[in-house]
């Protein structure tokens, strides 16, 4: 009987699917790298979300591991090259949390433009800051979307009713343009200079270098906003903090960080930054969908 380790918290739908398929399953979350190394030789399959880092050391110890499933889209917490060297299959669930992530990106946009977190905090304290809070409307603005996969496409559809111009930076858009007449393809520099809101929904660069740095902020409108619900190393956090403090841009909303869990970060306490703890994909609905998808994929692989 195949055996699978679920090492991150997720919907119990995954466990039920494995059990239904007569696959032994252990749910052991919050383990350290060393703790995983001790037990991983027992397992044919492994399921993670974003907390577990599937390192080379873990893979070297995984003498029986055949498949690793990521309940989510990105696989940057898995050492994919090493897994391939060992003929281990790496699976993910693209699209499973796209709607949740796009909705959160939209929520971040609205929060930073309307200063909702500040309004909420001060009102709870009995401070009536009405005269000091003036928001910005979406209508007639330009939204720039970097990356046009499942999340980027969904976000573009969510904002259709706001009478916005939508610019997209995506290598693959030209071949799909007829399917998305409401957007316009743009090069990176034009997009960031023309957009009122720049929202990132792309992979990190292969070399690990940030896509947005001080030089880019200098090209942006001083009234513009940056949204990142993709990957933490896409934007240079120090440069972003400096850009906010120097007035190069008006604000930012960030859900992902260069180091997570983010116990300390240069953006903390910056009043122009709205920050959330990597929760874009964290909805009841998305957690069920990705758990179901990854469990079915791994079951099919191990049983066929």
PLM segments and residue spans:
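Short, Asp-centered acidic motifs that coordinate Mg2+ and/or phosphate
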Residues: 44-45, 67, 197, 225, ...
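An N-terminal-biased, well-structured beta-alpha scaffold segment characteristic
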Residues: 1-91, 191-193, 213-219
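Short glycine-/small-residue-rich Rossmann-like dinucleotide-binding loops
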Residues: 51, 73, 196, 201-204, ...
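Rossmann-like dinucleotide/phosphate-binding beta-alpha-beta segment
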Residues: 131-222
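N-terminal Rossmann-fold cofactor-binding loop
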Residues: 8, 29-30, 168-172, 230
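Short, conserved active-site loop motifs that form the nucleotide-linked donor/cofactor pocket
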Residues: 23, 88, 183, 272-274
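Rossmann-like dinucleotide-binding domain for NAD(H)/NADP(H)
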Residues: 90-91, 165, 223-304
């Amino acid at each position: 009987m195949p055996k699978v380790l679920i090492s991150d918290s997720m919907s119990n739908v995954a466990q039920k699917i494995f059990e239904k398929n007569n696959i032994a399953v252990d749910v052991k979350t919050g383990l350290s790298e060393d703790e995983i190394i001790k037990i991983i030789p027992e397992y044919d399959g492994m399921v993670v979300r974003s907390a577990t880092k599937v390192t080379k050391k873990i893979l070297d110890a995984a003498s029986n591991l055949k498949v690793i499933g990521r309940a989510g889209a990105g696989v940057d917490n898995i050492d994919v090259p090493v897994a391939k060297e060992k003929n281990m299959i790496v699976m993910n669930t693209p699209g499973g949390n796209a709607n949740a992530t796009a909705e959160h990106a939209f929520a971040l946009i609205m929060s930073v433009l309307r200063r909702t977190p500040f309004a909420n905090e001060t009102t709870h304290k009995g401070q009536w800051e009405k005269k000091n809070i003036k928001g910005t409307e979406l209508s007639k603005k330009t939204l720039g979307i970097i990356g046009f996969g499942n999340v980027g496409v969904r976000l573009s559809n969510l904002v259709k009713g706001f009478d916005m111009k939508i610019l997209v930076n995506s290598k693959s858009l030209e071949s799909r343009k007829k399917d998305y007449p409401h957007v316009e393809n743009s090069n990176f520099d034009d997009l960031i200079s023309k957009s009122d809101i720049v929202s990132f929904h792309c992979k990190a660069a292969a070399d690990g270098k940030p896509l947005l740095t001080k030089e880019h902020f200098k090209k942006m409108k001083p009234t513009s906003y940056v949204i990142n619900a993709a990957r933490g190393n896409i934007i240079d956090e120090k440069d972003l903090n400096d850009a906010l403090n120097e007035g190069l841009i008006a604000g930012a909303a960030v859900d992902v960080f260069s180091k997570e869990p983010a116990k300390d970060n240069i953006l903390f306490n910056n009043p122009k930054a709205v920050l959330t703890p990597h929760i874009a994909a964290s909805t009841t609905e998305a957690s069920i969908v990705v758990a179901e998808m990854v469990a079915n994929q791994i079951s099919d692989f191990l049983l066929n």
